[in-house]
């Protein structure tokens, strides 16, 4: 089935199968625009799509559905302090 992927304000058409794992979807997105796989965080209807699941685990995904992608940039430095509440580096950044 064909779905839309929205990343950095651009939309791409992406062919997916119900048996495709989310890791495979991330790889396909990487092929579309070069974003590193580890920075790709797909969402459907506001819910994170988890690694280890497949497209069929998300019944709301049908032909023409839109998958939103958040790109989370991580600091390369192991010395950056992490926030107690979120556990994320203060240098983390989310791009949509």
UniProtKB/Swiss-Prot annotation:
UniProt-recorded name of the protein: Ubiquitin-like protein NEDD8-like protein 1
InterPro entries per record: Ubiquitin-like_dom, Ubiquitin-like_domsf
PANTHER family xref list: UV EXCISION REPAIR PROTEIN RAD23
Molecular function terms from GO: protein tag activity; ubiquitin protein ligase binding
GO CC, any one term: cytoplasm
Coiled coil: none
Region called Disordered, residue ranges: 75-96
Pfam families (alphabetical): ubiquitin (PF00240)
Top-level taxonomy: Eukaryota, Amoebozoa, Evosea, Eumycetozoa, Dictyostelia
GO biological process, one term: protein ubiquitination
Bias (Basic and acidic residues): 79-96
Protein family: Belongs to the ubiquitin family.
PROSITE patterns the record matches: UBIQUITIN_2
């Amino acid at each position: 089935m064909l779905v839309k992927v929205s990343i950095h304000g651009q939309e791409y058409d992406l062919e997916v199968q119900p048996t495709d794992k989310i890791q495979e979807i991330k790889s396909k997105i990487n092929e579309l625009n070069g974003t590193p796989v580890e920075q790709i965080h797909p969402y459907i209807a506001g819910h994170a799509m988890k690694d280890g699941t497949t497209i069929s685990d998300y019944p709301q995904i049908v032909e023409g559905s839109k998958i939103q992608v958040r790109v989370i940039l991580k600091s390369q430095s192991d010395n950056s302090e992490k926030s107690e509440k979120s556990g994320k580096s203060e240098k983390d950044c989310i791009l949509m």
